[in-house]
């Protein structure tokens, strides 16, 4: 099941990013909810919240090391919690989605923008980012419930 989640997450991320490249990269913005939610193309050459700008090689290496660590953990410990395995699968699919962008584009395609008028703008993000955040929350809940 975890492999299917990872594959589905990567496919969903790729489809939405290809759509953003085609429809939004020319500077076109699609407003979904006026003054609150829109699709707006951004080439993110860093990590979350714009940190590590221009450090593509570092980000690729860190992502690869983390993926190797996760695979090692799953092979060695074979976790039994379905909730935890699903959460980690979300994290892996999101990480691999953004890794693909970094390797092939040298930046990550972001396009989801939440803002309040012109007063506040949350950093632009993508489906892979959502998967990583949801998976991390699930993993944290699992760890808190298990007391480990």
UniProtKB/Swiss-Prot annotation:
Recorded topology in the membrane: Multi-pass membrane protein
Keyword Transferase: no
InterPro entries named in the record: Peptidase_A8 (IPR001872)
Family (UniProt): Belongs to the peptidase A8 family.
Catalytic residues, chain numbering: 110, 129
Keyword ATP-binding in annotation: no
Protein name stated in the entry: Lipoprotein signal peptidase
Transmembrane segments: 57-77, 88-105, 124-144
GO MF term set: aspartic-type endopeptidase activity
Organism expressing this protein natively: Clostridium novyi (strain NT)
Entry function: This protein specifically catalyzes the removal of signal peptides from prolipoproteins.
Pathway linked to the protein: Protein modification; lipoprotein biosynthesis (signal peptide cleavage)
């Amino acid at each position: 099941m975890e492999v299917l989640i990872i594959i589905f997450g990567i496919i969903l991320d790729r489809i939405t990013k290809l759509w953003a490249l085609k429809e939004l990269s020319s500077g076109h913005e699609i407003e979904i909810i006026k003054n609150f939610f829109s699709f707006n193309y951004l080439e993110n050459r860093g990590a979350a919240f714009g940190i590590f700008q221009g450090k593509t090689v570092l980000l690729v290496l860190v992502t690869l090391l983390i993926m190797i660590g996760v695979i090692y953990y799953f092979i060695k410990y074979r976790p039994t919690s379905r909730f935890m395995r699903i959460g980690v699968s979300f994290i892996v699919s999101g990480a691999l989605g953004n890794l693909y962008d970094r390797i092939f584009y040298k930046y990550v395609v972001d396009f989801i923008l939440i803002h309040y008028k012109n007063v506040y703008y949350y950093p632009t993000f993508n489906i892979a980012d959502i998967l990583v955040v949801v998976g991390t929350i699930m993993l944290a809940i699992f760890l808190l419930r298990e007391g480990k």
